[in-house]
Amino acid sequence: MITTEIKRVKNHINGEWVESTGTEVEAVPNPATGKIIAYVPLSPKEDVERAVEAAKNAYETWSKVPVPNRSRMLYKYLQLLQENKDELSKIITLENGKTLKDASGEVQRGIEAVELATSAPNLMMGQALPNIAGGIDGSIWRYPLGVVAGITPFNFPMMIPLWMFPLAIACGNTFVLKTSERTPLLAERLVELFYEAGFPKGVLNLVQGGKEVVNSILENKEIQAVSFVGSEPVARYVYETGTKYGKRVQALAGAKNHAIVMPDCNLEKTVQGVIGSAFGSSGERCMACSVVAVLDEIADEFIDALVSETRKLKVGDGFHEENYVGPLIRESHKERVIGYINSGVADGASLLVDGRQIKEDVEGGYFVGATIFDGVNQNMKIWQDEIFAPVLSIVRVRDLEEGIQLTNQSKFANGAVIYTSSGKHAQTFRDHIDAGMIGVNVNVPAPMAFFAFAGNKASFYGDLGTNGKDGVQFYTRKKVVTERWF
């Protein structure tokens, strides 16, 4: 329940809310106002060790619970999440800043991830082949790993944790969760509802904190696997450190997603699609459109329409329905984004819409409005770097081939989109673009939870993505049995 009092956030270990054993805390502001809404502990290594011990003890019994029984408990959790959708959305808007509409969409995507986890009995089924040789049968069996952990970012405080712990727990593992210290309140509510669903103590443990918690998770010998979503430098660090300590790691990293706009596109729908992808959730998502490669033939018409519609977008508190662009997560990130806008201007890009100039009264909040650059090239930092904000770069290209070449020059390869009415163009794009997730006239090509989610190149470190069959394979180990009976 949302209140006006400043909350002191706790850890949840072995089925109980407990104070951190450390003394260091960090203030959690509402990004729309700058006012403090909570204090979160920066937990020390000892808290992680307690959580891991609780998870290890719980694993001894939880791993023996029949798979259908685990699934039934997740159905109860799913029901509770659905019953509390409005409250969960409001918590997200309060501590993350995204609009209620965007928050509600995130809640729904999180619920869909739990729906996937409830199907664990089907997803965990192995394989068998009788009589592979004279009187010999072969089969593959899947078993849980043990204690696993998840490290999640601020930008999707509900959806991304729900990619991780429900599926891991459905597979028979126990879990240690470290969510972003910037959005601790939603994590608390997810854990409360989890135990309200009747799960045994210690199956899910929550440790709040920063880098010390991350390092403690990566170095703890009892943790068998780590799931991570965050920025590229940290993802690389998590992958390299976790694997050094013998862990299975999936680390989803940064992005610089491109959209190619063809002359045969539906112009009106393309403009609205690019706006939604680039400026929704204030651009703070790894699937946001950051660059549009528009063909010369339609460039002026597309850009005129895009700029006209973008200037209509209102900036402000996400609780107010009329606002489209909410705040960025922190003042420091706002200053970083303004630095990128200044860089684009200095490098010679044409600033068509300036998000530094906000006409609405947003005093106290961390706001940058929708921003559009034209005349961008590959030598500019605004093309090269992940800005993680409502900043869109436009590059004019001669044809589809040049658009694909431009996109593939990025070190990132998370998502890519083409807007076209040509099946041939779509097939060429699909076959030659280097991206893990591809959209054809789909604004944000993030797949549903029953498909795997992962990028390529510097957007992903690991072998198995989150969700779908990849997720089940990540959270289980297989045993291949060859047997003969006399």
UniProtKB/Swiss-Prot annotation:
Enzyme Commission no: 1.2.1.27
GO BP of this protein: inositol catabolic process; thymine catabolic process; valine catabolic process
PROSITE patterns per UniProt: ALDEHYDE_DEHYDR_CYS
Superkingdom: Bacteria
Catalyzed chemical reaction(s): 3-oxopropanoate + NAD(+) + CoA + H2O = hydrogencarbonate + acetyl-CoA + NADH + H(+); 2-methyl-3-oxopropanoate + NAD(+) + CoA + H2O = propanoyl-CoA + hydrogencarbonate + NADH + H(+)
Positions annotated to bind NAD(+): F154, K178, E181, R182, S231, E386
Keyword Hydrolase: no
Entry keyword set: NAD, Oxidoreductase
Active site: C286 (nucleophile)
GO molecular function, one term: methylmalonate-semialdehyde dehydrogenase (acylating, NAD) activity
NAD found in the keyword field: yes
Pathway(s) this gene product operates in, as recorded in its UniProt entry: Polyol metabolism; myo-inositol degradation into acetyl-CoA; acetyl-CoA from myo-inositol: step 7/7
UniProt cross-references to Pfam families, sorted A to Z: Aldedh (PF00171)
Cross-referenced InterPro entries: Ald_DH/histidinol_DH, Ald_DH_C, Ald_DH_CS_CYS, Ald_DH_N, Aldehyde_DH_dom, MeMal-semiAld_DH, MSDH_GmP_bac
Assembly and oligomerization: Homotetramer.
Family classification: Belongs to the aldehyde dehydrogenase family. IolA subfamily.
Function: Catalyzes the oxidation of malonate semialdehyde (MSA) and methylmalonate semialdehyde (MMSA) into acetyl-CoA and propanoyl-CoA, respectively. Is involved in a myo-inositol catabolic pathway. Bicarbonate, and not CO2, is the end-product of the enzymatic reaction.
Protein's name according to its UniProt entry: Malonate-semialdehyde dehydrogenase
Source species of the chain: Bacillus cytotoxicus (strain DSM 22905 / CIP 110041 / 391-98 / NVH 391-98)
Gene name of the encoded protein: iolA
